[in-house]
Amino acid sequence: MVLIEQVVLVASILITFGTCLAATKYAARLFPHFEPLQFYDEATNPMELNIVLAFVVGLIGSVVVLLYFDSQKIKPVLNPTQWQQYRLMEKQKLSDNTALYRFKLPRSNNILGLPIGQHISVQANMGGKTVVRSYTPTSSDDDHGFFDLVVKSYEQGNVSKYIGSMKIGDLLSVKGPKGQMRYAPGLSRHIGMIAGGTGLTPCLQIIRAALKNPADKTQIDFIYANVKETDILLKDELDELALKHKDQFRISYFLNEAPEGWKGGVGFVTKEALEKNLPKPANDIKVLMCGPPPMIKAMTGHLEALGYEKPRTVSKLEDQVFCF
């Protein structure tokens, strides 16, 4: 409940109680200097104090109920200017060095409050130095009481290594939201996506949002590149979404080290692969990218050669090519 609501509530209680008390002789007894203001008469029922007390009890009960329902409201917890700590409640291994981490929100009806396509800042103390990195939760505001991060822990990493070492019950410092992307139905007629490794996370957030909304007709083509097949994150979910929404969502996998019998792309993503799998350049399409810097640099060059607009250093929502 915001401060102004609290002030109004307290003022209403005091005014109501004062008015009720003024209707009885007890106001004059409690506050003699207010006696000229009393408007009772001598014929007042001797049970009037009980009436006042019953009214007050009822009023207090109403306030308690009001506060209870206020506590049950779905409330976002993120604060863009203040670090807040959330406790690790689950850890699920996805690959050799990648896991899904589930963090508990203060209440079961809380939501993170993250616009689709935006991310959070995560803070860790490493060797006496504070390090901050950005991550995109794979959960959404449809998920109450928790949020999920998919993190690949690198041996030479900072925050990723810190998260990888966390144990159940440990606390993580978070603030946000931040970022220029804010997805909504109708943002583009057709979206192409290019991701490498954990660059999947902002793309997946948008994919889920678009496909679960029957009114959202956005076409999505997704190129997802990894080193090995075991590096492909959440593949079962991606394949299920592609099968269930085959008229709207298509995914193309690329591996540097493809196993025997692999039916997807092999090697680095080429200009020809982009031309084949992405929407053609137009005013009503977007290409979203997230991955390692060398990959993004290579993809940017390929896209420019194919006639797409050159992305800005810091992408904006209106850009045709957007880099997370």
UniProtKB/Swiss-Prot annotation:
The keyword Oxidoreductase applies. GO terms for cellular component: mitochondrial outer membrane. The keyword Oxidoreductase applies. CDD domains: cyt_b5_reduct_like. GO terms for molecular function: 2-(3-amino-3-carboxypropyl)histidine synthase activity; cytochrome-b5 reductase activity, acting on NAD(P)H; NADH dehydrogenase activity. It is found in: Mitochondrion outer membrane. FAD binds at residues 164-179, 190-222. It catalyses: 2 Fe(III)-[cytochrome b5] + NADH = 2 Fe(II)-[cytochrome b5] + NAD(+) + H(+); 2 Fe(3+)-[Dph3] + NADH = 2 Fe(2+)-[Dph3] + NAD(+) + H(+). Its cofactor is FAD. Its EC number is 1.6.2.2. The chain crosses the membrane at residues 49-69. Pathway: Protein modification; peptidyl-diphthamide biosynthesis. One of its GO terms (biological process) is tRNA wobble base 5-methoxycarbonylmethyl-2-thiouridinylation. It is a single-pass membrane protein. Residues 81-184 form the FAD-binding FR-type domain. Keywords: FAD, Flavoprotein, Membrane, Mitochondrion, Mitochondrion outer membrane, NAD, Oxidoreductase, Transferase, Transmembrane, Transmembrane helix. Monomer. Component of the 2-(3-amino-3-carboxypropyl)histidine synthase complex composed of DPH1, DPH2, DPH3 and a NADH-dependent reductase, predominantly CBR1. NADH-dependent reductase for DPH3 and cytochrome b5. Required for the first step of diphthamide biosynthesis, a post-translational modification of histidine which occurs in elongation factor 2. DPH1 and DPH2 transfer a 3-amino-3-carboxypropyl (ACP) group from S-adenosyl-L-methionine (SAM) to a histidine residue, the reaction is assisted by a reduction system comprising DPH3 and a NADH-dependent reductase, predominantly CBR1. By reducing DPH3, also involved in the formation of the tRNA wobble base modification mcm5s 2U (5-methoxycarbonylmethyl-2-thiouridine), mediated by the elongator complex. Belongs to the flavoprotein pyridine nucleotide cytochrome reductase family. This is NADH-cytochrome b5 reductase 1. It comes from Mycosarcoma maydis (Corn smut fungus).
